[in-house]
Amino acid sequence: MDRARYDRLAILFHWVMAALIFYAAASILIADDLPRGAFRDLIKTSHDSVGAVVVVLLALRILWRLVSRAPAMPSAMTAQQQRLAKLAHLGLYALMAMVPLLGLATLFLRGRGLEFGFFSIASPLAANRALSRSIKEVHELAAYALLALVAFHVAAALWHQFIKRDGLMRRMSFSRSSPAGQTP
Protein backbone atom coordinates (compact mmCIF):
# COMPACT_ATOMS: atom_id res chain seq x y z
CA MET A 1 0.00 0.00 0.00
CA ASP A 2 1.18 3.52 -0.81
CA ARG A 3 2.00 5.00 2.61
CA ALA A 4 2.71 8.44 1.13
CA ARG A 5 -1.06 8.84 0.72
CA TYR A 6 -4.19 8.50 2.76
CA ASP A 7 -6.37 5.53 1.86
CA ARG A 8 -9.49 6.04 -0.25
CA LEU A 9 -11.92 5.91 2.67
CA ALA A 10 -9.97 8.56 4.60
CA ILE A 11 -9.92 10.71 1.46
CA LEU A 12 -13.67 10.22 1.00
CA PHE A 13 -14.32 11.21 4.64
CA HIS A 14 -12.15 14.31 4.18
CA TRP A 15 -13.87 15.63 1.06
CA VAL A 16 -17.44 14.71 2.03
CA MET A 17 -17.00 16.39 5.41
CA ALA A 18 -15.37 19.43 3.78
CA ALA A 19 -18.40 19.78 1.48
CA LEU A 20 -20.86 19.35 4.37
CA ILE A 21 -19.05 21.87 6.56
CA PHE A 22 -18.96 24.34 3.67
CA TYR A 23 -22.70 23.80 3.13
CA ALA A 24 -23.47 24.22 6.84
CA ALA A 25 -21.54 27.50 7.00
CA ALA A 26 -22.89 28.90 3.74
CA SER A 27 -26.48 27.81 4.39
CA ILE A 28 -26.77 29.53 7.75
CA LEU A 29 -25.15 32.72 6.46
CA ILE A 30 -27.59 32.74 3.54
CA ALA A 31 -30.60 31.82 5.72
CA ASP A 32 -29.93 34.73 8.05
CA ASP A 33 -30.44 37.11 5.10
CA LEU A 34 -33.62 35.47 3.80
CA PRO A 35 -37.10 36.72 4.68
CA ARG A 36 -38.97 34.60 7.20
CA GLY A 37 -40.90 31.80 5.57
CA ALA A 38 -40.88 28.21 4.40
CA PHE A 39 -37.72 28.49 2.28
CA ARG A 40 -35.73 30.04 5.12
CA ASP A 41 -37.02 27.34 7.49
CA LEU A 42 -35.98 24.65 5.01
CA ILE A 43 -32.45 26.07 4.75
CA LYS A 44 -32.12 26.31 8.55
CA THR A 45 -33.48 22.78 8.99
CA SER A 46 -31.00 21.46 6.44
CA HIS A 47 -28.22 23.28 8.32
CA ASP A 48 -29.21 21.42 11.50
CA SER A 49 -29.50 18.07 9.73
CA VAL A 50 -26.13 18.46 8.01
CA GLY A 51 -24.58 19.23 11.41
CA ALA A 52 -25.92 15.95 12.76
CA VAL A 53 -24.54 14.07 9.74
CA VAL A 54 -21.13 15.70 10.36
CA VAL A 55 -21.17 14.34 13.94
CA VAL A 56 -21.86 10.80 12.69
CA LEU A 57 -19.26 11.02 9.92
CA LEU A 58 -16.68 12.44 12.31
CA ALA A 59 -17.22 9.52 14.70
CA LEU A 60 -16.76 7.09 11.80
CA ARG A 61 -13.74 9.04 10.58
CA ILE A 62 -12.09 8.89 13.99
CA LEU A 63 -12.78 5.16 14.26
CA TRP A 64 -11.27 4.67 10.81
CA ARG A 65 -8.25 6.76 11.77
CA LEU A 66 -7.71 4.54 14.82
CA VAL A 67 -7.61 1.36 12.72
CA SER A 68 -5.95 2.81 9.61
CA ARG A 69 -2.61 4.52 10.02
CA ALA A 70 -2.14 7.95 8.53
CA PRO A 71 0.81 8.32 6.18
CA ALA A 72 4.00 9.69 7.67
CA MET A 73 4.67 13.38 7.30
CA PRO A 74 7.01 14.15 4.41
CA SER A 75 10.64 14.16 5.50
CA ALA A 76 11.11 17.58 3.86
CA MET A 77 8.90 19.12 6.57
CA THR A 78 10.79 20.50 9.54
CA ALA A 79 9.99 19.24 13.03
CA GLN A 80 8.30 22.57 13.75
CA GLN A 81 6.14 22.31 10.61
CA GLN A 82 5.17 18.75 11.56
CA ARG A 83 4.19 19.86 15.08
CA LEU A 84 2.16 22.75 13.66
CA ALA A 85 0.42 20.42 11.18
CA LYS A 86 -0.44 17.94 13.95
CA LEU A 87 -1.72 20.74 16.20
CA ALA A 88 -3.83 22.18 13.36
CA HIS A 89 -5.32 18.76 12.60
CA LEU A 90 -6.10 18.21 16.28
CA GLY A 91 -7.81 21.60 16.37
CA LEU A 92 -9.80 20.75 13.25
CA TYR A 93 -11.00 17.48 14.75
CA ALA A 94 -11.90 19.15 18.06
CA LEU A 95 -13.84 21.94 16.37
CA MET A 96 -15.51 19.56 13.88
CA ALA A 97 -16.95 17.79 16.94
CA MET A 98 -17.60 20.84 19.08
CA VAL A 99 -19.44 23.01 16.54
CA PRO A 100 -22.19 20.56 15.52
CA LEU A 101 -22.60 19.16 19.04
CA LEU A 102 -23.12 22.69 20.37
CA GLY A 103 -25.51 23.32 17.49
CA LEU A 104 -27.53 20.22 18.36
CA ALA A 105 -27.58 21.26 22.03
CA THR A 106 -28.87 24.69 20.97
CA LEU A 107 -31.60 23.11 18.86
CA PHE A 108 -32.66 20.58 21.51
CA LEU A 109 -32.66 23.16 24.32
CA ARG A 110 -35.03 25.26 22.22
CA GLY A 111 -37.38 22.29 22.45
CA ARG A 112 -36.99 21.50 18.77
CA GLY A 113 -36.24 18.13 17.28
CA LEU A 114 -33.98 17.25 14.40
CA GLU A 115 -35.74 16.98 11.03
CA PHE A 116 -34.48 14.82 8.17
CA GLY A 117 -37.51 15.13 5.89
CA PHE A 118 -38.52 11.49 6.01
CA PHE A 119 -38.00 11.11 9.77
CA SER A 120 -37.27 13.23 12.80
CA ILE A 121 -35.54 12.87 16.16
CA ALA A 122 -37.31 14.44 19.11
CA SER A 123 -35.36 16.60 21.50
CA PRO A 124 -33.96 14.50 24.35
CA LEU A 125 -33.54 17.63 26.48
CA ALA A 126 -35.99 19.76 28.41
CA ALA A 127 -36.44 23.17 26.83
CA ASN A 128 -34.30 25.92 28.35
CA ARG A 129 -34.28 28.96 26.07
CA ALA A 130 -31.79 30.95 28.14
CA LEU A 131 -29.25 28.13 28.13
CA SER A 132 -29.96 27.58 24.42
CA ARG A 133 -29.09 31.22 23.67
CA SER A 134 -25.85 30.98 25.65
CA ILE A 135 -24.80 27.76 23.94
CA LYS A 136 -25.72 29.26 20.55
CA GLU A 137 -23.22 32.08 21.17
CA VAL A 138 -20.46 29.54 21.90
CA HIS A 139 -21.56 27.51 18.85
CA GLU A 140 -21.20 30.58 16.63
CA LEU A 141 -17.79 31.53 18.06
CA ALA A 142 -16.56 27.94 17.65
CA ALA A 143 -17.91 27.91 14.07
CA TYR A 144 -15.90 31.04 13.24
CA ALA A 145 -12.83 29.45 14.84
CA LEU A 146 -13.40 26.33 12.72
CA LEU A 147 -13.69 28.43 9.56
CA ALA A 148 -10.48 30.29 10.46
CA LEU A 149 -8.66 27.00 11.02
CA VAL A 150 -10.06 25.60 7.76
CA ALA A 151 -8.77 28.73 5.99
CA PHE A 152 -5.33 28.14 7.55
CA HIS A 153 -5.50 24.47 6.48
CA VAL A 154 -6.38 25.44 2.89
CA ALA A 155 -3.67 28.13 2.83
CA ALA A 156 -1.09 25.61 4.05
CA ALA A 157 -2.17 23.09 1.40
CA LEU A 158 -1.93 25.75 -1.31
CA TRP A 159 1.49 26.83 0.00
CA HIS A 160 2.69 23.24 -0.28
CA GLN A 161 1.20 22.91 -3.76
CA PHE A 162 2.26 26.18 -5.37
CA ILE A 163 5.20 27.54 -3.33
CA LYS A 164 7.00 24.45 -2.07
CA ARG A 165 5.75 22.32 -4.97
CA ASP A 166 6.25 19.21 -2.84
CA GLY A 167 3.12 17.37 -4.01
CA LEU A 168 1.69 17.21 -0.50
CA MET A 169 -1.86 17.79 -1.74
CA ARG A 170 -1.78 14.50 -3.64
CA ARG A 171 -1.87 12.72 -0.25
CA MET A 172 -5.55 13.70 -0.02
CA SER A 173 -6.46 13.31 -3.69
CA PHE A 174 -8.21 10.44 -5.44
CA SER A 175 -5.52 10.61 -8.13
CA ARG A 176 -3.27 7.55 -8.27
CA SER A 177 -0.05 9.56 -8.69
CA SER A 178 2.27 9.67 -5.68
CA PRO A 179 3.49 12.83 -3.97
CA ALA A 180 6.69 14.22 -5.46
CA GLY A 181 9.80 12.34 -4.47
CA GLN A 182 7.89 9.36 -3.05
CA THR A 183 7.26 6.03 -4.67
CA PRO A 184 4.15 3.90 -4.28
Regions found by a protein language model. Name each.
Residues 1-184:
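Membrane-embedded alpha-helical bundles that constitute the cytochrome b-like, heme-associated redox core
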